[in-house]
């Protein structure tokens, strides 16, 4: 089965225009994310990657560094729509599509590999999560005091499929102190915004209108649940550099501070 990792990279952003070209420790964000996709594709059989953009500046930047890139329609409403457009332009014989968000430059290669493995094992849609330690949960709660819509939680059933995604921290924890004494891990699962689709499921997904809870939460994956598509959840280890993505210029400084502590995962000439 053939897989394609798509990195949607849109120039326009209300909070951070030109974000894909922003430098993090001297390397552009789109180049960092494409590097992750490229390394994952090189590790797997029958796998390729491509950057999908609507902007000539981003395309030229990718070409300068030898990165695969295609131009997609500027009116694509979501990264999933852009990913599907990339498949139709770049690799129509694709079976599985991985949507690696362009503002997630610190995604571990192992996470992408785990998602493609789940698709090969029969998942219609697969997405990763980490189970939070109590200290990580405390940090998430503090973060949400400043930015309430940062970070997404997922409820997972016994079949390892998603029951609900929310920008609230779910589930609520009654008797939390006792839970803290029982385990170093909290019951909270934090969703990582990476999606793997069977191509036919992605085609159906983008054809459906925005769903009720998707609109309320601002989470497009809820469209899948509201249309009865099972979403397999794949547990992964927390990344060495843990960020929610790069959404503002201030996030660049935070990312560079983390690089200074943990080292730079980028593989390639600066």
Where are these regions (language model features)?
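A short acidic, helix-capping loop that chelates divalent metal ions and anchors anionic groups
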Residues: 13-18, 136-137, 204, 242-243
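Short phosphate-binding loop-to-helix
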Residues: 56-117
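Conserved alpha/beta core of the MobA/IspD/sugar-nucleotide pyrophosphorylase nucleotidyltransferase superfamily
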Residues: 92, 165, 178-270
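N-terminal glycine-rich phosphate-binding loop and ensuing alpha1 helix
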Residues: 2-53
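Hydrophobic/aromatic residues located in beta-strands of well-ordered beta-sheets
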Residues: 5, 48-51, 97, 125, ...
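Conserved core of the sugar-phosphate nucleotidyltransferase
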Residues: 107-208
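Short, high-confidence coil segments that cap the C-terminus of an alpha-helix
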Residues: 46, 92-94, 121-125
């Amino acid at each position: 089965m053939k897989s394609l990792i798509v990195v949607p990279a849109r120039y326009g952003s209300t909070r951070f225009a030109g974000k894909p070209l922003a430098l993090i420790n001297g390397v552009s964000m789109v180049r960092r994310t494409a590097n992750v996709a490229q390394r994952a594709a090189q590790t797997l059989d029958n796998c390729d990657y491509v950057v999908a953009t609507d902007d000539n500046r981003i395309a030229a930047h990718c070409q300068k560094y030898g990165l695969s890139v295609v131009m997609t329609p500027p009116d694509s409403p979501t990264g999933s729509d852009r990913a599907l457009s990339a498949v139709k332009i770049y690799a129509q014989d694709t079976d599985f599509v991985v949507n690696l968000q362009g503002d997630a430059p610190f995604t571990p290669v192992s996470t992408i590999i785990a998602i493609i493995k789940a698709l090969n094992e029969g998942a219609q849609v697969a997405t990763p999560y980490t189970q939070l330690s109590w200290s990580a949960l405390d940090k998430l709660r503090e973060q949400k005091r400043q930015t309430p819509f940062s970070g997404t939680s997922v409820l997972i059933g016994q079949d390892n499929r998603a029951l609900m995604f929310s920008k609230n921290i779910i589930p609520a924890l009654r008797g939390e102190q006792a839970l803290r004494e029982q385990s170093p891990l909290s019951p909270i699962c934090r969703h990582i915004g990476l999606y793997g689709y069977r191509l036919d499921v992605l085609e159906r997904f983008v054809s459906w209108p925005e769903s009720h809870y998707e609109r309320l939460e601002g989470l497009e994956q809820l469209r899948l649940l509201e249309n009865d598509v099972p979403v397999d959840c794949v547990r992964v280890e927390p990344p060495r550099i843990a960020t929610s993505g790069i959404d503002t210029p201030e996030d660049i400084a935070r990312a560079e501070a983390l690089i200074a502590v943990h080292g730079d995962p980028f593989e390639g000439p600066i």
